[in-house]
Swiss-Prot record:
This is NAD(P)H-quinone oxidoreductase subunit I, chloroplastic. [4Fe-4S] cluster 2 binds at residues 71, 101, 104, 107. Residues 52-81, 92-121 form the 4Fe-4S ferredoxin-type domain. Its EC number is 7.1.1.-. Keywords: 4Fe-4S, Chloroplast, Iron, Iron-sulfur, Membrane, Metal-binding, NAD, NADP, Plastid, Plastoquinone, Quinone, Repeat, Thylakoid, Translocase. Belongs to the complex I 23 kDa subunit family. It comes from Staurastrum punctulatum. It is a peripheral membrane protein.
């Protein structure tokens, strides 16, 4: 009888401890700032090396087609004609279909004239897939930087990230560049 009562009290204390631990975890999660954002109204600032939409500078392109050769899916469409008078290629048109692009960045990395660059634009969705086929004019437009976008609100107080990450990270502008008000 005494052993049974002793075991019962030990089990009750162990159960209370487990319930207390679970309750402590719940309270800890309730005190944290949520990591999610309200996307259309708040936007994350992409990191410095983010691979977004490709920007193309028509005047720098020499129509060498290196971008087509290094692309895993041979995506960029380069149309050129040979100018006999100048004895070099003349670029006529350049286009990329972002509905097919895998944003690997090989074209940007291997371009000898640096006429291709990655932007921080990530809002490419559309209802018509043909709108994702960008020609040289659409590729030449620079998007507004996300850091200057009035809709971007930095995420404040990501308290459960380690302090080292907040101070050492140069990759994530969202975490390090916030107002301390």
């Amino acid at each position: 009888m005494i052993n049974g009562l002793k075991n019962y009290s030990q089990d009750a204390l162990r159960a209370a401890r487990y319930i207390g631990q679970g309750f402590f975890v719940t309270l800890d999660h309730m005190n944290r700032t949520p990591i999610t954002i309200q996307y259309p109204y708040e936007k994350l600032i992409p990191s410095e090396r983010f691979r977004g939409r490709i920007h193309f500078e028509f005047d720098k392109c020499i129509a060498c087609e290196v971008c087509v050769r290094v692309c895993p899916i041979n995506l960029p469409v380069v149309d050129w004609e040979f100018q006999k008078s100048m004895k070099k290629k003349q670029l006529k048109s350049y286009s990329i279909d972002f509905g097919v692009c895998i944003f690997c960045g090989n074209c940007v990395e291997f371009c000898p004239t640096n006429c291709l660059s990655m932007t921080e634009e990530y809002e490419l969705s559309s209802y018509d897939r043909h709108e994702l086929n960008y020609d040289q004019v659409a590729l030449g437009r620079l998007p507004n930087p996300a850091s200057k976008d009035p809709l971007v609100h930095p995420i404040l107080g990501l308290g459960y990230l380690q302090k080292k990450l907040l101070t050492q990270s140069t990759e994530s502008k969202t975490i390090t560049n916030f107002d301390k008000s």
